């Protein structure tokens, strides 16, 4: 996990948010349709017109995150991603203002650029021009509040998002939007585990997901690759055929006999049937080759 610095993209984010709000604005009633504090508002914002074009907001989020999942750092593909609201669309608490403040108190970015949708809905806009002056957007559609996450599936591309679903609508300290995340998130190359220091109760469930055996195996492998040769051309490694993958694993495990490598890692080479699914999955996590292992 790393700090997602959205600041260089703020102008583009606000331009897309303003465009959507202006399209929803009815000058006769001086109101928005659909209302900004409804699920239909986000549903409309997610339509192809706003989200999927080359200049759409999905591509913008991918640029901001360098095509990486905001949680596990897997390389993102448009066919296998989901959108994460840092401040959930539907705050499942009695006092939404208190819950909202828990996020903004911990992230200056959210405090400066996002407004609770129910508060925004009470604002009075006399004209379309008034919308152009907005600098805090309703949290359901504020791009400042949106991140991209992977689908969390290891064996096949499918809908849904494991990372996202692990969190649901529960409060989660917005570490990805906090510069100090680099010091707080620690990956252990020996066990493959990820931990947060100091511990944070809101992350317990998410860390259980991120410490799934497959995630840990992948981190262990990347730590071994990093230890073996930090000057490798990973793009060349990515294209290795099965025979070269086997030789590569023998090197990183320092074994002359492939059978001496623990069985759980064999699948990452493509054995026994030449299936490259797990090899490709491993390569999707090449961010860990650049991680400063401790």
Range-by-range predicted roles:
Residues 137-139, 144-151, 155-221:
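Long, low-complexity, intrinsically disordered segments enriched in glycines and aromatic residues
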Residues 195-294:
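C-terminal, charged low-complexity interaction regions
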Residues 54-81, 150-157:
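Short cysteine-rich loop/turn motifs with clustered Cys
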Residues 51-60, 133-140:
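Short, intrinsically disordered, charge-biased short linear motifs at domain edges
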Residues 1-56, 75-77, 91, 292-294:
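A boundary/linker detector
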Residues 74-148, 157:
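Histidine-centered nuclease catalytic patch
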Residues 21, 41, 57-61, 96, ...:
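Generic structural signal of hydrophobic/aromatic residues within well-ordered alpha-helices
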Residues 4-22, 165-182, 265-289, 293:
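C-terminal/domain-terminus segments
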């Amino acid at each position: 996990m790393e700090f997602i610095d959205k600041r260089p993209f703020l102008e583009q984010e606000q331009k897309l948010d303003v465009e959507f709000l202006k399209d929803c604005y009815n000058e006769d009633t001086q109101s928005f349709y659909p209302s900004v504090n409804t699920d239909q508002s986000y549903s409309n914002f997610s339509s192809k017109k706003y989200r999927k074009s080359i200049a759409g907001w999905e591509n913008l989020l991918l640029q901001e995150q360098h095509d990486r999942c905001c949680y596990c750092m897997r390389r993102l593909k448009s066919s296998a991603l989901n959108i994460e609201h840092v401040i959930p669309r539907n705050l499942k608490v009695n006092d939404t203002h208190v819950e909202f403040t828990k996020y903004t108190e911990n992230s200056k970015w959210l405090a400066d650029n996002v407004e609770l949708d129910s508060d925004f809905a009470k604002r009075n806009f006399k004209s379309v021009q008034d919308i152009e002056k907005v600098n805090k957007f309703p949290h359901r559609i504020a791009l400042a509040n949106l991140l991209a996450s992977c689908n969390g599936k290891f064996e096949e591309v499918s809908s849904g998002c494991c990372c996202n679903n692990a969190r649901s609508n529960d409060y989660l300290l917005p570490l990805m939007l906090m510069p100090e995340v680099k010091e707080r998130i620690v990956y252990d190359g020996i066990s493959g585990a990820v931990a947060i220091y100091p511990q944070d109760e809101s992350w317990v469930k998410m860390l259980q997901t991120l410490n799934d055996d497959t995630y840990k195996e992948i981190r262990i492998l990347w730590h071994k690759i990093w230890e073996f040769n930090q000057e490798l051309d990973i793009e060349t490694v990515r294209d290795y055929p099965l025979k070269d993958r086997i030789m590569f694993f023998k090197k990183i495990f320092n074994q002359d006999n492939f059978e001496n490598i623990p069985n759980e890692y064999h699948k990452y080479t493509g054995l026994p049937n030449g299936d490259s699914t797990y090899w490709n999955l491993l390569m999707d996590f090449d961010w860990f080759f650049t991680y400063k292992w401790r």
